[in-house]
Amino acid sequence: PELGGAISAVLAVLGSASAVIGSVQAVGARNLLRLTAYAGAAQAGCVLLSVALGSPAGFAAALMQLVAFAAAALALYGGAAAGRVHALEMLDGYGQRAPLASAAITVGALSLMGAPLTIGFLARWRLVEAGVGAGWWWAAGLVIIASLAGVFYGGRLIERIYFRRADIAYAGEGGVWRVALAPALVAAIVAIAIGLA
C-alpha cells in the first residue's frame, strides 16, 4: 500500500529520532532491562523507517525488524532472569556461573548489534536494501550508525560476561528462575537459524 507523502515524512522523522535517541540511551544504560528497552526504542525507530518507505521491501524489512527484536529481547531477558541479573555489574563473570544463560545473552547481544549470522544482521540488511532501493541513502546511513551504537552496548554485555570477574558472589542458573532459560535458548537458536537461512 502506498503511503501519503506527509505520513511518510512524519514516520521517517519519528523513526530517525527514535533510532538515534534509543541508541544513545542504550549506550549509557547501566541496567540490563533499561538497556534492552532503549535498544527496543532504537529498533522501533528502524521499524518506522521501514514503514515510511511505503514499499513491499520496506514492509518486509519492518516485519523482520520486529521478529529480530523479539528474539533478541527474549534471549536477553530470559538469560538474565535465569540468574536473576538486572544490573550490568551482575554480568561480571556470568559466563562461568551460568554458561547456558550467558550463551543466550550473547546471541541476543550479537543480534542487537546486527552481527552477521544473526537475524539482527538480516533485518538491518533488508532495511538498508529497501532504503537504498527507494533512494533513501540517509536512512541506510542511519541504520549503520545505529548498528555501530549496538556494537558499543552489545559488546559491553559480552565483555562483562566473559572478560570480567565478579567482585561479589552472585547466583548462577537455578531455582525457580531456571524456567526462563528454555525460552531464552529457543530464542537464541531462532536468532541464529534465521540468520543462517
What does each of the following model-derived ranges do?
Residues Q96-A103, G154-A197:
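Cytoplasmic/organellar membrane-interface segments at the starts of transmembrane helices
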